[in-house]
């Protein structure tokens, strides 16, 4: 059994390295894929209206790297409308199996149409038809109406390629702040914040430890 003195000695060293935040994110995501039972790429997406009224929901991360963190959705949904009105967003990844979380903050931009097309057509056909049938975030009088819309989409496209609706697209959050958190004994948790600074070719990431 580890002694209290040994535990305290270990706690004096951060377990979150001062490194490339995107490489660290990729490493943690791979570990999450190996340990989380469901949807390790699930993330909470927070948006807000221009006057600051917030809303949050779970979405799935579909791409990540120095370019940002990408997800896909109906642009006419509540989140889509809020993104168009206020580009500032925040993401949260929480992996209970690893006792870790990552927070991301930054503006969001829409992906190119060809990128949205490629991802849309990589999805299961039923998911494509569901996107066509769903009037996301709008009132639904009866579930049977939704099923009827799905069947109508099936008939419309028959065996042909399902056309991506113009309102269905992708968004990429360009991070300006990325914070990594991990659980440690005695609630002396580990936090490291990476902040983007500079401009143009002089952009760089700086990191600092935070009190938990």
From Swiss-Prot:
Instruction: Tell me which UniProt keywords the record has, alphabetically.
Output: Flavoprotein, FMN, Oxidoreductase, Pyridoxine biosynthesis
TM spans (from-to): none
Name the InterPro entries on file: Pyridox_Oxase (IPR000659), Pyridox_Oxase_CS (IPR019740), Pyridox_Oxase_N (IPR011576), Pyridoxamine_oxidase_dimer_C (IPR019576), Split_barrel_FMN-bd (IPR012349)
For the protein in the UniProt heading, the enzyme class is: oxidoreductase
Provide a Gene Ontology MF annotation, just one: pyridoxamine phosphate oxidase activity
| The reaction(s) this protein catalyses | pyridoxamine 5'-phosphate + O2 + H2O = pyridoxal 5'-phosphate + H2O2 + NH4(+); pyridoxine 5'-phosphate + O2 = pyridoxal 5'-phosphate + H2O2
Q: Which residues bind FMN?
A: 57-62, 72-73, 78-79, 101, 136-137, 181, 191
Enzyme Commission numbers on file: 1.4.3.5
Named in its record, the pathway it takes part in is:
Cofactor metabolism; pyridoxal 5'-phosphate salvage; pyridoxal 5'-phosphate from pyridoxamine 5'-phosphate: step 1/1; Cofactor metabolism; pyridoxal 5'-phosphate salvage; pyridoxal 5'-phosphate from pyridoxine 5'-phosphate: step 1/1
Q: Which family does it belong to?
A: Belongs to the pyridoxamine 5'-phosphate oxidase family.
Q: Which NCBIfam families match?
A: pdxH, PRK05679.1
Q: Which PANTHER family match?
A: PYRIDOXINE-5'-PHOSPHATE OXIDASE, PYRIDOXINE-5-PHOSPHATE OXIDASE
Tell me the protein's name.
Pyridoxine/pyridoxamine 5'-phosphate oxidase
Q: Which organism is it from?
A: Erythrobacter litoralis (strain HTCC2594)
Q: Which gene encodes it?
A: pdxH
């Amino acid at each position: 059994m580890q002694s209290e003195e040994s535990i305290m000695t270990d706690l004096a060293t951060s377990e979150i390295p001062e490194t490339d935040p995107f490489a660290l994110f990729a490493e943690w995501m791979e570990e999450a894929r190996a340990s989380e039972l469901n949807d390790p790429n699930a993330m909470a997406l927070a948006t807000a209206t221009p006057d600051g009224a917030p809303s949050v929901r779970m979405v799935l991360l579909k791409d990540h790297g120095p370019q940002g963190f990408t997800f896909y959705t109906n642009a006419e949904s509540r989140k889509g409308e809020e993104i168009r009105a206020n580009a500032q967003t925040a993401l949260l990844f929480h992996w209970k199996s690893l006792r870790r979380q990552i927070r991301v903050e930054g503006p969001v931009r829409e992906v190119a149409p060809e990128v949205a097309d490629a991802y849309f057509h990589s999805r299961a056909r039923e998911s494509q038809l569901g996107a066509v049938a769903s009037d996301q975030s709008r009132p639904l009088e009866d579930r049977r109406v939704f099923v009827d819309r799905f069947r109508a989409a099936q008939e419309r496209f028959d065996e042909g390629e399902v056309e991506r609706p113009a309102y269905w697209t992708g968004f990429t959050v360009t991070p300006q702040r990325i914070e990594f958190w991990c659980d440690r004994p005695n609630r002396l948790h580990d936090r490291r914040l990476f902040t983007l600074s500079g401009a143009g070719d002089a952009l760089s990431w700086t990191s600092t430890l935070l009190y938990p």
